[in-house]
């Protein structure tokens, strides 16, 4: 899930629609609401955030420090002004990257992945996706590949696979996966749907790989395990 902070509801709603077409869930806040949320959000919820996108708002320079107090996810600022000085000020405030409008959400996703690669937060990564054993994921709306061949998946299963690979080495519980895929405020979907998605994903991976790469432990959660 990506958190978008902007003074304008029209902008946060627009990002929700655009990212949604790529299978990415977003949650939008005004700066005031974001301050209250980031102060009180439970640890397991904020750990499900994949990135923060800071749009035009009066507190644009202050927000990166607030985010860093709670989370290490990539922070990207959207610069509406064609000003070098403003761009430099945004970098000095602690953002990981600055993009200028107009920008496609796929470029934003690619920049998020590049930040993760530089931070060493993912598995073996290159300019074109993240490789874990025979599996390559892209996190930009494209289907994953297994041994270089496209491996089409429904959107939710694809996002779960991407999230597990992005968090290789960590065991993720059902709540964390649900929050990352559906958003932390989605009350219309039951968390148990995660078990159904993962069951289907495991069956497909087992059929393609000849083994099940997703390890599960009751009460502890799931992790992807490929040597």
Swiss-Prot record:
GO biological process: regulation of DNA-templated transcription
InterPro entries found in the cross-reference section: CheY-like_superfamily, OmpR/PhoB-type_DNA-bd, Sig_transdc_resp-reg_C-effctor, Sig_transdc_resp-reg_receiver, WalR-like, WH-like_DNA-bd_sf
GO cellular component: cytosol; protein-DNA complex
Extra information: There is no cognate histidine kinase partner identified so far for FtcR.
DNA bind region: 127-226
Domain Response regulatory: 1-116
Matches recorded under SUPFAM superfamilies: C-terminal effector domain of the bipartite response regulators, CheY-like
Domain of life: Bacteria
Organism classification: Bacteria, Pseudomonadati, Pseudomonadota, Alphaproteobacteria, Hyphomicrobiales
Annotated knockout phenotype: Inactivation of the ftcR gene down-regulates the activity of the fliF promoter region and the production of both flgE and fliC proteins during vegetative growth or during macrophage infection. This mutant also lacks the flagellar structures under growth conditions in which the wild-type strain is flagellated. The mutant is not attenuated in cellular infection models but exhibits a marked virulence defect after 4 weeks or more of infection in mice.
Gene assigned in the entry: ftcR
Name under which the protein is recorded: Flagellar transcriptional regulator FtcR
Pfam families: Trans_reg_C (PF00486)
Any one GO MF annotation of this record: phosphorelay response regulator activity
Keywords of the record: DNA-binding, Transcription, Transcription regulation
Function: Required for transcription of the fliF gene during vegetative and intracellular growth and for production of the two flagellar components flgE and fliC during vegetative growth. Specifically binds to the fliF promoter region. Could mediate the action of VjbR on flagellar gene expression.
SMART domains, per database record: Trans_reg_C
